[in-house]
Each structure stands twice: as structure tokens, then as C-alpha cells.
């Protein structure tokens, strides 16, 4: 519509060239076909008036001068003197003059709004740059590219550029120029990895796509993950934007606190930094500041750490920091003032009075004091909020778990926490009395309250059912994998409770597995259970009874440790660092470095909060069992692969399921963020598989275990056994519907489908042979019919059709396959056995020639022997050369390594040719050798003339005994007369095989040739003229002789 309202001067610049139409009579140029037709209505010598067009277009009633003049002035443009038939057309035209035209032509009064239009218009004034179309001379172009585009689109077609070498056509000259690189020997595009060169850049790109090792690797600057393309890197960077991604600061800006998000100081970070040093080195450390994390990952398989690339899904700590709850002011102050390297006893100000009273009266009921502290903690909830990010330290690679709903904590959660605390105190109340002083007990419970409150949320039904059946089937396998892979990467050889070394290395020290109450995991049963508000004391005996009577909880390590003490023979995997006072309750503020340290280094850090008080009470009874001070829901890392520490070797599968099957992590995922798609978690699984693959190189003894694991991931499987979407990464579009094979391009699939359908659309015009690929047809015509062999070998003057075949031929010269008499071997070029076998064969033929030449001294035998052996040798050499030529010609037919049809065709061609050639060489050799030998041996004159050589000839004749008995089976008694030299022509006539039937004649004749060949081998063994070569060729002789003897036995049994 715009083109109708505005002239071309008002339009945006056109990418196509402005077409011009020339008048054949006056050579005047016109911008449109209509202007040219209007011009041709009148003679070119008398230029017509613009009003004549209007006059011609109006009816005759307007022919009077007054009306015509009025009409002319009414419909004439005053700016450009154009005349229009009606007022409406004139008004439309006048719109083009409303804006100022900046660009005016210096050769004509035309002006343009766009500079590009002015430049294109000025080219029309230059008569030297006019390009006319040969087919339609009326069209003139100012740019030769526009003329070529016009010819392709209007006259010739889409593929006007033909290759002079192969006849292939192309749509553009650039395509033809690029194609001509194929016919040259220059290969400028080289792979940087394997140094393979190509004539075209597209072939190099395809090579890199097909070979994963040669792909260009682009490294992510944030996490170090490698990618082959920039597009895949850009997609990855959406999920990996730096260390603050998925954190509160990363999602909502630096320094902005989420509602209810507590700050984490160094002390809190120390308490939750339990990352094993060896494990961190293996999975890669992602150093992030503290803050809430919202990983958008499902419950399985993302509960496995290491599935995600570093910084892709930031892993929360094994044991979380001060839980996402508004803690006591005293707790915040103490954590602020505490240094990670200084051990100071901290006393909570909120409990000063109680602690003083307890210090004065140690006999006060400690459980009541604990209850009082609990109630006071519940009533003191500060509302201040602190910054999300703590100071930078060497422990800043820990991120906190998500899902803290601080403002909407219900009373049932608090009651459940109280209930769990009661259960813990019932089970371990006596242990607290024996273990610590009242002051320590109060401080421990206060810290415990800080962790427990508001940290457990009931998951929804979907999250509870997120773990699939495949998880249950893989629990045992995952436990084995974790034990095998990570057993030596943690604290190796940690002593157990009794001070002895563990039977197998432990992956984590004891504090990695806090004591969990069963009520923490039975979320549906929480609301129906009573909520106790009083904590009743219980005797140690009752506690022990309860512990023995309870079924072992998969997360309650307290009962586990109690059981371990009762039965020390059971292997323990708790692996707690022991010392002279290892029974002291562990403080979970210990960092990973101190946990990986020795026993002496661990002791002061382990109880740095209570160490002074402990020194003040040296007479406290010590027990070997205790419970950890923080009961909380299943953390992010409490999954089967890390819970192998509790595994017994003989546990049945159902018990393992109860132990290692992680409940649905309801608190892990924030409700505001959706679950990831399949591509995200498949990428995570792939990352885990790659890490396990690389880790296996350090532990090769794990191969047998992993290969037998029936895991759903099949970690140790080959690359072909992995899912295709992990290997192809988006190239599943071109899949064969017959065999399921996947191709990176549609052209490859089309070519492959012809192998199933048998379609061969390309037919040779000379021999009517059909091909499924056009390149095979071109190669066939070039090599077979045209005999084009421009590439010549400078060593043997052989010619080849392509440079690649010449290069292959030159390599044979370098390896020595074509040097000396190596071509004399009937198998040298066909089987490609190498130069060593050629030397053996060459020595074998030399021995036969030398033996015959030295053993034959009469007038006939030297001539016959030389002619026989040399003749057969020449024929063998000729056959070997022909096989070499044929092999090279066939090699020329194998140019494209991706050409499936040509590979199959060459295999089919090579096999019959090889067998036929071997048979032909054997037949020629046996005919030349066998016939002449028999004829020369049975000649009576030979034995009558010379008696000196009787001994040698007798041996020679004995070697023919098997042949003679087969060839002349009915006259075997007469054959023995050869020893006495009594032969005549009548007896010789009886030696013919005319009396044999045709069924026996052919197989016996063929077997006789094999026996003659075996005879020559035996002769070469009897008199070796080259000791150096005889030893090297002994194996070759034995093999050939054994084959000949087996055929002789077979032929005798057949007769």
C-alpha cells in the first residue's frame, strides 16, 4: 500500500538494482516498462508532449480547446510537471512532495529522500556501466551481480555454473569456486587436534562434529565446563551466571535481604562447612557467599551431589547453619563475636540466671532447667533482619538450603520440634548427665533449639512421590558405587570408637551424620501425634531398654552408635576423629580443615566452646556414646551415595531401602520456582557420568564392580551404551526409520536410506550402471571410462586419478611393499601382510630357484627347470603387479570415508577378486611346475644318459610318490619302475588319466597341483642355500606344507 501512495523517492532503499529499459530506436532509458511503451507510441524524432497522453486517454467529448486546457491544468503536478488522468491520482502523487528531498541529482532535476536511491540513480547517467541482458535486451543493469541474478532467475535456472572437471553445477560462482578445491591437491583446512586436512571448510566442520575429541572446546569462565559451540555455551550461561546465581543476592540484587532470611557469619559457616577435602577436590568446589539457594531441581536424581556442574546447582551444606529462623540475640551476638580460629566459651545472656543457679546447685533437675530454657527460647523471637552476605573467608563456598518460611511458622512445627526434643532427651538423657555439666547441657540444648525451630516443613504430595521406582532398584548399586569410589577420597583409615582402624576407609567423619528423630520424617503422622509439653526424666537403664527395643532408624545415628558399642565386631563407618577425650560431645562449628586434620589438631577445635568448662570439671564421667546436638530434616546431601557409612555388608535390599532411601525433600525447593525440564537434569546426569568416568582412571580396580552394577545410570558403561541424547545433544532429528541410526545432517540420512530401499537414481550413460550417490557415478566415469589419471608416481611412473590414491601409493613405497621382489608374492598386495611376510615369500622363491638350478646339470633339466620356475615366478610377479594395480584401482573407488555404499561395494569386489587371483596364481604355478616336472621325470632318455644324478633323482621321484599314486592310481605298480630307469613309450601311455571318470578327474587334477607345490616346499627344506633366510622362512614353509599334506589326505580319502 505504501508503494501506491508514495513514489519510489519516498520509499526506503531497495536491495535490488533499479532496472532500466532502453528504446531500441533512440537509446533513451526509462525506469519502467510502461514509460517505455508510452514512448514507443510516437516517433522518437519528435518528442511528444505530456498532454498528448492525457488527450489520448480522454473521451472525444473533451476535445474542445477550453475544456482540454482546463483539464490539463487541473491534473498537472506543478512541482514535477507530471499529468494525471484524474484528481485522485494527482492527490496521491502530491503526497510525495510533502517532505523535503535532501539528495538531488547534479545531472537532472530529480531529488531523493534516500542517499542510496540517489547513488543508484546516478549510475543510470553513467553510460559506461550499463549491463544489458543478452536474452532480453530491453533490460539494462548498472551492476553485473544484478544481471547475473536476473539471468539465473529468468533464463538459465538455479544452477548455471558448471564445473569443467566433473560437470557438477552450482547456483553461484562462489559455490563453484569452493567446489574446485576438491579437484586440487591443496588441503588448506587442517584439524588442530588430529591434523587431518580437508579441501573444504565444510568438511572440516563435519569432521569436528563427528569426532568429539576434535571439537572446539570453549570453557565457561564461571564453572570451567567445556562446550563445543558458542550456542551451547550461551545456553549454559543462563544457568551459570556467577557465584551469586540462585542465591538471594544473585536473584534480588546485592545487599538486599529476603524477608526472613538470616545472616550467616563465620561461625555459622564453620558449623555447616563439612565438605570433605577429597570430595571437594573430586566434585569441584563452588565458592559462593552465603544466602538462600533455590535450586530448581526435582527430588531425584538431584539429591546426588556432583550430578551438577560446579556453580550450576550450588550445593547446600551437609549440615545447615543456624537454621533459617530468627535466633536469640545472644546467639547472634556470640556468633558475631566468635572467630573461627579462636576457641572461646560463650554463655548465652538469655540464660544467665539459670546457669548461675545450676553452677551453684549442680543437683538441680537438669531436665526442668532444659524445659525452662525451651520455653524461654520460644517466647524470645527477635524480628531484626541482617544482611544476607557474610564476610569473605576461606569457608565461603557453602550455600544454605532453601525453603525457610520464617514469617508463617505454625505452632505445629514448634510442637513437633518439642516432641522430637523430648524423644532425644528420653533416649539420651542419661548420656547428657554423664557427658557434660549442666552449663554445657543448657548451652547445647539452646544451640539445638536454634537449629530445630522452623526448619522442618511438610512436603506436598507431589514432592513425596518424586522418587521413582528406579531409585529403589538402584539403592544397593549406588551404595556400592559410593563405597568404591569415595572410600579413599575422604579421611582414610579413621579409627573407630575402640581406637582400631576401620576395615575399610571412611568417607566422612562422624559429625556428617547428625542424629535424626524418626518423627522428623514421618510427615503425615505429625499432626495426629500428641504434643508433649513436659520433659520427664528417665533413668539410664530405661534409656538403654528403649534403645534396644526400638527398630533402627535410617537417620537416627544415636541408636546406631549404641548398637555398635554393644556389638564391636560389626564394621563401623562412623569414622569419628578420636582422641584421649573423644567422648566429648562434638561441636558442629568445626570446619572441614580441622576435620581432615590429625587427632591432636582436631581436639581443641572439637570442643572449643566448652573447653574451659571442661577443664574446670575434670571429674565428669566419660561415656563413649552421645547424640549430636542438632536434629533436623534430611539435608540436601543425605542421599544414598553418602549414606553408605551406615551400610552393613550383609544387609538385605529392603533394609537398605529403609536406610538409604531418602524421603522427599520438601524443604529443599522453594515453592516460587518451578521444577526443571528433562534437559536440565539429563545434563546433570551426564555431568555425573563424566566425573565418574574420569575418576575411574585413578581407581582402575573399580571396573569389575561398576560393570556389574545394575544401576539405572550405568556409570561405567561405554559411550555407546549411554543415552543418545547425552551423546548427540540435539541431533536426533535425522534418524533412520529402518535401523534407528542417527545422522547429523539430512543429506546423510537421505544417502543412508538408499541402502535400505535400494534406490539408485544415478545411471552411467556409458555402461548403464546405477549408483545411489552422484559422487560415485562421477568417480566411476572418471576412473573407468575416461581413464583420467593425472597424478603420476615419480618412483614407478604409475598414474592415479586422485591425489589421495597417489599418497596411499607413495606410502607403500615408504613401507617397502613395492621395493625389490616384494611384488613377486602372490599375497603381498592383496592381503596387505606387510614387508616381513614379503621377505619370507621372496626367500622361499629364491630357495626353489637356487635348488633347481644347482641340482639340475643335464642338458634338459636346467633349461626345463629354469623355464619352469622362472616362468612361474614371472607369472606370479605379473599377477602380483596386477593385483597391486587392481588394489590401487579399487582404492580409487574408495574416496569418501562416509560413503557407505562404496565401502560395501569395494568389500564385495575385493573378496572374489582376491580368491580368484590366489587360485589363478596357484593354477599357473602348478601347471608350469607340475606338468614340466612330471614330463621331465618320466623321460627314459634322461636316466639312460646320465647315471651320476640317480641319487638326487631318486629323492626327487620319491617326493612325487603321492602325486603319482593319485594321478595314476590304477598303475601304481608300474610307477615303481622309475627307480630302475626302465620306461618306454608304451608304458608312458598307460600313465594317462583317460580311464578316470570326469567326476574324479577334475578334483584329482586340482589336488595334484597342490601336491606339486608341497613337493617344491620340501625340496627347499632339504637343501637350503641361504641359512640366514632359511630360518626366517621355516614357519612359512611349514604352514604351506601342512596345508598341502592335508589336501593330499583329503584327496586320497575321496578316491
Swiss-Prot record:
Acidic residues composition bias: which ranges? 944-954
Q: What is the residue range of the motif CTBP-binding motif 1? A: 554-558
Zn finger limits (C2H2-type): 21-48, 75-97, 103-125, 131-155, 161-183, 189-211, 218-240, 734-756, 762-785, 791-813
Q: Name one Pfam family in it.
A: zf-C2H2_6
SMART domains, alphabetized: ZnF_C2H2
Write out the residue ranges of the motif CTBP-binding motif 2. Answer: 585-589
Keyword annotations for this protein, in alphabetical order, are: Developmental protein, DNA-binding, Metal-binding, Nucleus, Repeat, Repressor, Transcription, Transcription regulation, Zinc, Zinc-finger
Task: Outline the inducing conditions.
Answer: By retinoic acid (RA) signaling. Repressed by wt1 and by notch signaling.
Subcellular location, in the record's words? Nucleus; Nucleus speckle
What residue spans carry the region label Disordered? Answer: 324-345, 372-423, 531-621, 813-837, 922-957
Q: Which Gene3D superfamilies match?
A: Classic Zinc Finger
InterPro entries in alphabetical order: Zinc_finger, Znf_C2H2_sf, Znf_C2H2_type
Query: Can you tell which superkingdom this protein's organism belongs to?
Result: Eukaryota
The GO terms describing molecular function are: DNA-binding transcription activator activity, RNA polymerase II-specific; RNA polymerase II cis-regulatory region sequence-specific DNA binding; zinc ion binding
Q: Where is composition skewed (Basic and acidic residues) in this entry?
A: 381-392, 531-566, 602-621
One annotated Gene Ontology cellular component of this protein: nuclear speck
This protein's major location comes to nucleus
Q: Which SUPFAM superfamilies match?
A: beta-beta-alpha zinc fingers (SSF57667)
Q: Where is this motif: Nuclear localization signal?
A: 422-435
Q: What is known of its domains?
A: The CTBP-binding motifs and the N-terminal group of zinc fingers are required for repressor activity in the pronephros.
Q: Which PANTHER family match?
A: PR DOMAIN ZINC FINGER PROTEIN, ZINC FINGER PROTEIN 154-LIKE
Q: What does it do? A: Transcriptional repressor during pronephros development. Plays a role in regionalization of the pronephros; may promote formation of the distal tubule and duct over formation of the glomus and proximal tubule.
What's the subunit arrangement here?
Homooligomer. Interacts with ctbp.
Q: Can you name this protein?
A: MDS1 and EVI1 complex locus protein EVI1-A
Amino acid at each position: 500500500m505504501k508503494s501506491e501512495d508514495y513514489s519510489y523517492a519516498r520509499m526506503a532503499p531497495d536491495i535490488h538494482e533499479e532496472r532500466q529499459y532502453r528504446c531500441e530506436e533512440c537509446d533513451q532509458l526509462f525506469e519502467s516498462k510502461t514509460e517505455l511503451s508510452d514512448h514507443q507510441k510516437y516517433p522518437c524524432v519528435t518528442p511528444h508532449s505530456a498532454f498528448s497522453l492525457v488527450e489520448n486517454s480522454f473521451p472525444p467529448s473533451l476535445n474542445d480547446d477550453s475544456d482540454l486546457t482546463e483539464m490539463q491544468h487541473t491534473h498537472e503536478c506543478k512541482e514535477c510537471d507530471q499529468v494525471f488522468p484524474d484528481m485522485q491520482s494527482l492527490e496521491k502523487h502530491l503526497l510525495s512532495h510533502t517532505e523535503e528531498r535532501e539528495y538531488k541529482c547534479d545531472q537532472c532535476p530529480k531529488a531523493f529522500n534516500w542517499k542510496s536511491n540517489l547513488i543508484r540513480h546516478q549510475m543510470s547517467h553513467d553510460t559506461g556501466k550499463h549491463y544489458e541482458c543478452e536474452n532480453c535486451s530491453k533490460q539494462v543493469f548498472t551492476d553485473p551481480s544484478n544481471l547475473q541474478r536476473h539471468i539465473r532467475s529468468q533464463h538459465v535456472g538455479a544452477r548455471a555454473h558448471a564445473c569443467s572437471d566433473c560437470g557438477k553445477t552450482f547456483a553461484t560462482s562462489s559455490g563453484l569456486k569452493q567446489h574446485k578445491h576438491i579437484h586440487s591437491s591443496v588441503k588448506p583446512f587442517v584439524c588442530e587436534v588430529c591434523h587431518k586436512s580437508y579441501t573444504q571448510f565444510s568438511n572440516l566442520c563435519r569432521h569436528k562434529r563427528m569426532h568429539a575429541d576434535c571439537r572446539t572446546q570453549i570453557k565457561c569462565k564461571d564453572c570451567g565446563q567445556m562446550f563445543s559451540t558458542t550456542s551451547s555455551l550461551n545456553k549454559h550461561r543462563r544457568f551459570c551466571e556467577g557465584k551469586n546465581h540462585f542465591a538471594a543476592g544473585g536473584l534480588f540484587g546485592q545487599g538486599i535481604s529476603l524477608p526472613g532470611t538470616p545472616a550467616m557469619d563465620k561461625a555459622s559457616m564453620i558449623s555447616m562447612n563439612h565438605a570433605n577435602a577429597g570430595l571437594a577436590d573430586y566434585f569441584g568446589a563452588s565458592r559462593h557467599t552465603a544466602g538462600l539457594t533455590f535450586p530448581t531441581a526435582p527430588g531425584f536424581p538431584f539429591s546426588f551431589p556432583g550430578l551438577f556442574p560446579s556453580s550450576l546447582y550450588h550445593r547446600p551444606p551437609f549440615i545447615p547453619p543456624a537454621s533459617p529462623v530468627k535466633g536469640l540475640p545472644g546467639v547472634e551476638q556470640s556468633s558475631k563475636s566468635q572467630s573461627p580460629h579462636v576457641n572461646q566459651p560463650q554463655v548465652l545472656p538469655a540464660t544467665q540466671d539459670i546457669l548461675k543457679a545450676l553452677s551453684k546447685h549442680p543437683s538441680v533437675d537438669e531436665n526442668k532447667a532444659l524445659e525452662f530454657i525451651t520455653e524461654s527460647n520460644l517466647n524470645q523471637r527477635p524480628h531484626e533482619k541482617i544482611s544476607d552476605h557474610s564476610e569473605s573467608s576461606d569457608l565461603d563456598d557453602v550455600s544454605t538450603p532453601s525453603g525457610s518460611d520464617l514469617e508463617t511458622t505454625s505452632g505445629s512445627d514448634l510442637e513437633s520440634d518439642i516432641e522430637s526434643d523430648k524423644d532425644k532427651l528420653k533416649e539420651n538423657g542419661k548420656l547428657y548427665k554423664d557427658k557434660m555439666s549442666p552449663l554445657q547441657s543448657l548451652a547445647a540444648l539452646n544451640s539445638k533449639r536454634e537449629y530445630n525451630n522452623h526448619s522442618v516443613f511438610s512436603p506436598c504430595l507431589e514432592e513425596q512421590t518424586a522418587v521413582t521406582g528406579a531409585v529403589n532398584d538402584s539403592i544397593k548399586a549406588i551404595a556400592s558405587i559410593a563405597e568404591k569410589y569415595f572410600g579413599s577420597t575422604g579421611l582414610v583409615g579413621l579409627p573407630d570408637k575402640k581406637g582400631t582402624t576401620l576395615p575399610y576407609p571412611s568417607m566422612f567423619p562422624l559429625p556428617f551424620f547428625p542424629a535424626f528423630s524418626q518423627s522428623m520424617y514421618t510427615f503425615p503422622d505429625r499432626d495426629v501425634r500428641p504434643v508433649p509439653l513436659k520433659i520427664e526424666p528417665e533413668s539410664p537403664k530405661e534409656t538403654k531398654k528403649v534403645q534396644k527395643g526400638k527398630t533402627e532408624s535410617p537417620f537416627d545415628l544415636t541408636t546406631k552408635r549404641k548398637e555398635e558399642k554393644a556389638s564391636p565386631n560389626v564394621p563401623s563407618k562412623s569414622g569419628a576423629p578420636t582422641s584421649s577425650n573423644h567422648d566429648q560431645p562434638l561441636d558442629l562449628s568445626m570446619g572441614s580443615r580441622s576435620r581432615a586434620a590429625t587427632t591432636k589438631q582436631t581436639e581443641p577445635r572439637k570442643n572449643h566452646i566448652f573447653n574451659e568448662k571442661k577443664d574446670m570439671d575434670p571429674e565428669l564421667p566419660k561415656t563413649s556414646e552421645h547424640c549430636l546436638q542438632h536434629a533436623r530434616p534430611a539435608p540436601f546431601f543425605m542421599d544414598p551415595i553418602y549414606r553408605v557409612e551406615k551400610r552393613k555388608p550383609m544387609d538385605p535390599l529392603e533394609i537398605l531401602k529403609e536406610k538409604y532411601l531418602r524421603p522427599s525433600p520438601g524443604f529443599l525447593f522453594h515453592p516460587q520456582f518451578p521444577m526443571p525440564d528433562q534437559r536440565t537434569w539429563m545434563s546433570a546426569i551426564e555431568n555425573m557420568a563424566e566425573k565418574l568416568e574420569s575418576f575411574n582412571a585413578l581407581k582402575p580396580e573399580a571396573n569389575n564392580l561398576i560393570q556389574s552394577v545394575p544401576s539405572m545410570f550405568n556409570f561405567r558403561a561405554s559411550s555407546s551404551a549411554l543415552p543418545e541424547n547425552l551423546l548427540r545433544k540435539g541431533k536426533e532429528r535425522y534418524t533412520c526409520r529402518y535401523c534407528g541410526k542417527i545422522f547429523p545432517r539430512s543429506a546423510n540420512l537421505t544417502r543412508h536410506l538408499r541402502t535400505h530401499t535400494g534406490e539408485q537414481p544415478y545411471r552411467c550413460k556409458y555402461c548403464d550402471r546405477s549408483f545411489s550417490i552422484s559422487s560415485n557415478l562421477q568417480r566411476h566415469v572418471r576412473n573407468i571410462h575416461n581413464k583420467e589419471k593425472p597424478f603420476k608416481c615419480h618412483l614407478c611412473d604409475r598414474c592415479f586419478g586422485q591425489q589421495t590414491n597417489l599418497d596411499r601409493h607413495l606410502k607403500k613405497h615408504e613401507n617397502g611393499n613395492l621395493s625389490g621382489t616384494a611384488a613377486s608374492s602372490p599375497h603381498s598386495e592383496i592381503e596387505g601382510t606387510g614387508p616381513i611376510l614379503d621377505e619370507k615369500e621372496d626367500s622361499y622363491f629364491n630357495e626353489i630357484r637356487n635348488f633347481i638350478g644347482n641340482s639340475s646339470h643335464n642338458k634338459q633339466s636346467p633349461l626345463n627347470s629354469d623355464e619352469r620356475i622362472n616362468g612361474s615366478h614371472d607369472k606370479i610377479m605379473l599377477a602380483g603387479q596386477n593385483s597391486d594395480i587392481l588394489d590401487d584401482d579399487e582404492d580409487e573407488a574408495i574416496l569418501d570415508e562416509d560413503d557407505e555404499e562404496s565401502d560395501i561395494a569395494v568389500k564385495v569386489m575385493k573378496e572374489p577378486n582376491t580368491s580368484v587371483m590366489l587360485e589363478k596364481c596357484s593354477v599357473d604355478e602348478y601347471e608350469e611346475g607340475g606338468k614340466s616336472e612330471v614330463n621331465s621325470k618320466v623321460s627314459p632318455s634322461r636316466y639312460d644318459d646320465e647315471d651320476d644324478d640317480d641319487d638326487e633323482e631318486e629323492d626327487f621321484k620319491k617326493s612325487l610318490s603321492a602325486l603319482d599314486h593319485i594321478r595314476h592310481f590304477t598303475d601304481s605298480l608300474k610307477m615303481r619302475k622309475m627307480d630302475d630307469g626302465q620306461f618306454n613309450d608304451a608304458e608312458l601311455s598307460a600313465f594317462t588319466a583317460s580311464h578316470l571318470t570326469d567326476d574324479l578327474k577334475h578334483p584329482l587334477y586340482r589336488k595334484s597341483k597342490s601336491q606339486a607345490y608341497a613337493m617344491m616346499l620340501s625340496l627347499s627344506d632339504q637343501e637350503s642355500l641361504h641359512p640366514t633366510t632359511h630360518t626366517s622362512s621355516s614357519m612359512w614353509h611349514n604352514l604351506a606344507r601342512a596345508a598341502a599334506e592335508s589336501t593330499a589326505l583329503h584327496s586320497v580319502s575321496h578316491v
